[in-house]
Each structure stands twice: as C-alpha cells, then as structure tokens.
C-alpha cells in the first residue's frame, strides 16, 4: 500500500502550484465565503490533557517549527479545535490546509505523527494548517447531532473550515489569498467536496486514497464503516442513501464543479508497503506483539479497503476525462 510517502510527493505538487502563478487562481476571499457567519477566535493553544496525550503534541510541543494554536467554532457551540501550523518564513504567502485521516489526532492518525510533513514543509515558505481534531466526522456538516464517543454534539466541520476559520487564521499568518486543501483517506472525500461547495476559493485540491462517490450502495456502506467507529451513522451525517443532501455530498456526481481547480488525485493499489510492516510500527515505539497484530490487520483489511479506493479513483478519472477536466494522478 502506498501511504504517506506518496502523499508528500503529492504535497510537493500542491506547494508548487501555490507558489507559482496559475491561471484560474482563487478569486473569492474568506470574507466573501463567510458572509454573515460568526467567525472563529484564534489564539495560542492551551493544551488539554487529551491533547497532551496525543503523539503529535508529544513529538512537537517544543519544536519551534510548529506553531500550536487553537480556534473556536461558533457553529459547534464554541468547541475549541487545536491547530498545528507550519508557518511560512515570509508574509504574503499561500496557505495549505491538510485534513487528517479517519481517526485524526484523537487516534494518532494525523499528518504530523504519520509523516515527515514538518520536515518537508519547514522551508517551503508556505503556511500549512492541520486541524488536530475531527475523528470520523468526514469534516462535513452533519444533519443530526450524534452522541458517540468521538462524534458528540454538533458536527459542522465544513462551516468551520471554510467560513469560520480562514479569515481570522490567514490574517494572523499574514497570508495571501492563495490556498489549497488536501485530505487523506476519509478526508480525501472532504477536500473534493469543500472545493465543489466553494468554487473559486481554492487554487488546488489534493485527494489522497479516498473515494469521491458516496451516494451509491457500496460507497454509502464505506461511509458507515468509518462513521460507526466514531459512534455515528451516515444517515445522521447526510441522510438516507441517495437523498438530496447525500447527492450534494457526492464528489463524483458533482465533478463538474471541480473545473478550474488544480487537482492532484492519488490512490493505493492494495499491496503492502513499508508503513504496513511490523518493523515500521516497532520503530515508532509500539509493543512488538501489537505491531505484528496491527500489521496483519492493515495488510488484510487495509488492502481490501485500498483496493476499493483504487476502484473509486478510476471511476473519478473516467468521469473527469469525459468532462475534459485535467488532473494529475499517482
């Protein structure tokens, strides 16, 4: 399975797109997208015991390359979201939003812990923002409030990430109006949707090892596998399969809305890679027995999932090719 090494290669393309002038650059400002929406308050992180227990914080709490911030979400009843930020060296630089995998930072499934994203972007002179929460949420606006272990209360992640956060955060970072958004696994669906729902806001979008389709029987059950782990259901999130809101959140059905945005789309084959082996997890400090058990689960269950994701990616490519919408694939 190609995991985060390929994601960082894709990140290089995203960074290159942002740093270089491109045709069809983002035209909408955060203020225009937010409209009358109440905005986040961005401040220095005051870590809770939960945050202090997370691997990313343990590894980077004293690393000056990572700015530790937090932002409130008015639409989620003032919930405080930790942010890991790799700031640009200079003002007036672009911003890349990286969305975490299914378990997010709550389960150490985040970009900082699972990759060398800090080393990679440290001298790229772009602002990189990683929201360190949102496990199993699909980073979307839910129709109903779940009451699970990870999914509890209002889930209005798209509102937070596209309307509440960018204005205050980008102002604090002295950023310009060029931005990209990228997601992996679960959030690879989310990054496509946010670009579709906010045309003209993002210059580039990365979708790594995810599934654009959501409103078809098999793909809808993929949603269930993920959100059930957080204590929610796809019906609570987007309504019944094929409902208007589910179709609105199907990136394959709405692929035309990606026209004019630079696209980087990557999937895995389902074959095991270095980061699926016991030795990789032992090197990360895991107990050897747990490492071998986890590796076996990854290679069997993960292989099936990633093979399905590969099929999803080919479906999206076929649709985009038919529409003459260019994208870079890996």
For the regions a protein language model found, what residue spans apply to each?
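Non-catalytic cap/lid and distal C-terminal segments of serine-dependent acyl enzymes
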Residues: 2-330
């Amino acid at each position: 399975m190609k995991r985060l090494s390929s994601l960082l290669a894709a990140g290089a393309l995203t960074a290159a797109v942002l740093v270089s002038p491109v045709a069809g650059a983002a035209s909408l400002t955060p203020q225009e997208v937010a409209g009358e929406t109440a905005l986040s308050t961005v401040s220095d992180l005051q870590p809770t015991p939960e945050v202090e227990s997370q691997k990313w914080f343990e590894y980077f709490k004293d690393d000056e390359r990572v700015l530790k911030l937090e932002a409130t979400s008015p639409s989620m009843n003032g919930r405080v979201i930790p942010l890991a930020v790799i700031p640009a060296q200079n003002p007036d630089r672009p911003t890349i939003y990286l969305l975490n995998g299914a378990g997010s930072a709550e389960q150490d499934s985040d970009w900082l812990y699972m990759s060398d994203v800090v080393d990679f972007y440290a001298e790229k002179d772009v602002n990189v923002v990683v929201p360190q929460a949102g496990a199993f949420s699909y980073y979307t606006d839910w129709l109903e409030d779940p009451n699970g272990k990870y999914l509890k209360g209002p889930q209005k992640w798209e509102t937070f990430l596209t309307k509440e956060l960018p204005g205050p955060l980008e102002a604090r970072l002295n950023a310009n109006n060029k931005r990209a958004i990228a997601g992996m696994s679960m959030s690879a669906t989310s990054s496509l949707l946010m670009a579709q729902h906010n045309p003209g806001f993002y210059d580039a979008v990365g979708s790594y090892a995810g599934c654009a389709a959501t409103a078809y029987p098999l793909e809808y059950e993929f949603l269930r596998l993920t959100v059930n782990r957080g204590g929610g259901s796809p019906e609570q999130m987007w309504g019944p399969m094929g409902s208007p809101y589910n179709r609105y959140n199907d990136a394959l059905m709405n692929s035309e809305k990606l026209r004019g945005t630079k696209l980087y789309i990557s999937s895995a084959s389902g074959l095991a890679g270095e980061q699926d082996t016991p030795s990789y997890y032992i090197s990360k400090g895991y107990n050897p027995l747990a490492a071998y058990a986890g590796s076996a689960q990854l290679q069997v269950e993960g292989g099936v999932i990633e093979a399905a994701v590969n099929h999803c990616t080919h479906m999206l490519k076929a649709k985009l090719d038919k529409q003459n919408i260019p994208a870079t694939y890996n």
